[in-house]
A protein has these predicted regions:
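An intracellular "coupling" helix at the cytosolic face of ABC transporter transmembrane type-1 domains
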Residues: 1-11, 54-57, 74, 97-99, ...
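ABC-type nucleotide-binding domain
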Residues: 78, 84-308
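Hydrophobic/aromatic residues in alpha-helical transmembrane segments
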Residues: 13-17, 44, 61, 207
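A hydrophobic transmembrane-helix motif
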Residues: 1-33
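Cytosolic ends of transmembrane helices, especially the final helix of ABC transmembrane type-1 domains
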Residues: 40-68
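Residue-level signal for transmembrane alpha-helical positions in Major Facilitator Superfamily
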Residues: 6-13, 57, 194, 248, ...
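Conserved E/DxxT/N motif and adjacent residues on the DHp alpha2 helix
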Residues: 67, 74, 187
Length: 308
C-alpha cells in the first residue's frame, strides 16, 4: 500500500511541478533538487514503516511466549533429592491414587503394579481406563496424590528428575519431531552421538530403509513435526532415538496403532530389538503388540481388575 501511495504522490508532484515550470513560477533546477531530496528521504521513511511491522510481529510473538516463560512447573524438586541409581530397573507402583487438577474424580485408585526388571509388562483395557496415566507417572510427567513409585526400591519422588528421565525412553503413537535433519532428530537425546552410532540405531529400527532413499539421506530436512514423513517412518525415527539412548526402562504407548500390516510388522521387529533384556511397559490394543509380554495387567476405570 505504501509503495502505491508513494508512486501516486510522485506522479502528482511531477504533474503540478510541470505546470508551475511552464508558467515560470518554479525553476527547473529547484524542482530536481526537491525531487532528489524527496527520493533520498523515501528509503528511511519506508524503513520506519517496515520497523513498525517488525515490532508488531515481535509483540505478537512475545504475547505467545511470555505465558510459557511464566508457567509454573507442577513437578518440583527438593534440595534433598538425589540421583537415582538403576541396576535391575524393577518398577513398583504402591497404592497409587491420582487425579488431574482439572478433574474432580480420581483417575487411578489404589493401583499396585510390579514391572519386572528386564521383562515386558503390558497394560490392556478400554480407552480412558487410565493406562496412559500409569505410564506418564513413571517419568514424573505428573506426581501422584497418594502412594509411591519405586525403581530398585528408590522412590522416584526423592530422585532428581533429570537423572530419572535419563534412564527412560518413551515411544508413543504421536512422535515429536523437529524441523531439522534426520541425523539431528535421531540424536536428539544424545547430542554427541557419532554418525556410526546414528546409522546403527537407524539400521536396527529399520529407519535406514527409507533414509537411504531421501534426497540428502541423513542430512535431509524433514519439515515441521516431520511433515515430509509418513506415520510409520516417524515411528521408526522415534525407535531409533530410543535405541541410540540405550535406556534401561522403555515405555511404549500404543506405538503400532494406526499402521498398516506391513509397516506394523517392521515396527514390531524394531521394538523387539529395542526391548530385549530391558524393563518395558507396553500399552496396546492390538494382540500382536503384547504377545511377547511376560506379565499383563487389565485396567478398568482406574483400577487393576486382573493380572496374569
Amino acid at each position: 500500500i505504501m509503495e502505491s501511495l508513494t508512486g501516486i504522490m510522485i506522479a502528482f508532484l511531477i504533474f503540478f511541478s510541470a505546470k508551475l515550470i511552464m508558467r515560470g513560477e518554479l525553476e527547473v533546477n529547484n524542482f530536481f533538487s526537491f525531487l532528489a531530496a524527496m527520493m533520498l528521504a523515501y528509503q528511511p521513511v519506508r524503513s520506519l514503516a517496515t520497523l513498525n511491522i517488525a515490532i508488531n510481529q515481535g509483540l505478537a510473538g512475545a504475547r505467545r511466549i511470555l505465558p510459557l516463560i511464566d508457567y509454573k512447573n507442577e513437578i518440583n524438586e527438593n534440595d534433598s533429592d538425589v540421583n537415582i541409581v538403576i541396576t535391575n530397573a524393577e518398577v513398583k507402583f504402591k497404592n497409587i491414587t491420582f487425579k488431574y487438577n482439572s478433574t474432580e474424580s480420581e483417575v487411578l485408585k489404589n493401583v499396585n503394579i510390579d514391572i519386572l526388571g528386564g521383562k515386558m509388562t503390558s497394560l490392556v483395557g478400554h480407552s480412558g481406563a487410565g493406562k496412559s496415566t500409569i505410564l506418564n507417572l513413571i517419568p514424573r510427567f505428573y506426581d501422584c496424590n497418594e502412594g509411591d513409585i519405586t525403581i530398585d526400591n528408590q522412590s522416584i519422588y526423592s530422585s532428581k528428575i533429570q537423572s530419572l528421565r535419563k534412564n527412560i525412553s518413551l515411544v508413543s503413537q504421536d512422535t515429536t519431531l523437529f524441523d531439522d535433519t534426520v541425523r539431528n532428530n535421531i540424536a536428539y537425546a544424545i547430542s554427541d552421538a557419532t554418525q556410526e552410532q546414528i546409522e546403527e540405531a537407524a539400521k536396527y529400527s529399520f529407519a535406514n530403509e527409507f533414509i537411504e532413499k531421501l534426497p540428502n539421506k541423513y542430512d535431509t530436512l524433514i519439515g515441521e513435526n516431520g511433515i515430509r514423513l509418513s506415520g510409520g517412518e516417524k515411528q521408526r525415527l522415534s525407535i531409533a532415538r530410543a535405541i541410540l539412548k540405550k535406556s534401561q526402562i522403555i515405555l511404549l504407548d500404543e506405538a503400532t496403532s494406526s499402521l498398516d500390516a506391513e509397516t506394523e510388522s517392521k515396527i514390531q521387529s524394531a521394538i523387539n530389538f529395542l526391548t530385549k533384556n530391558r524393563t518395558t511397559l507396553v500399552i496396546a490394543h492390538r494382540l500382536s503388540t503384547i504377545l511377547n509380554s511376560d506379565k499383563i495387567y487389565v485396567i478398568e476405570a482406574g483400577k487393576v481388575v486382573g493380572e496374569g
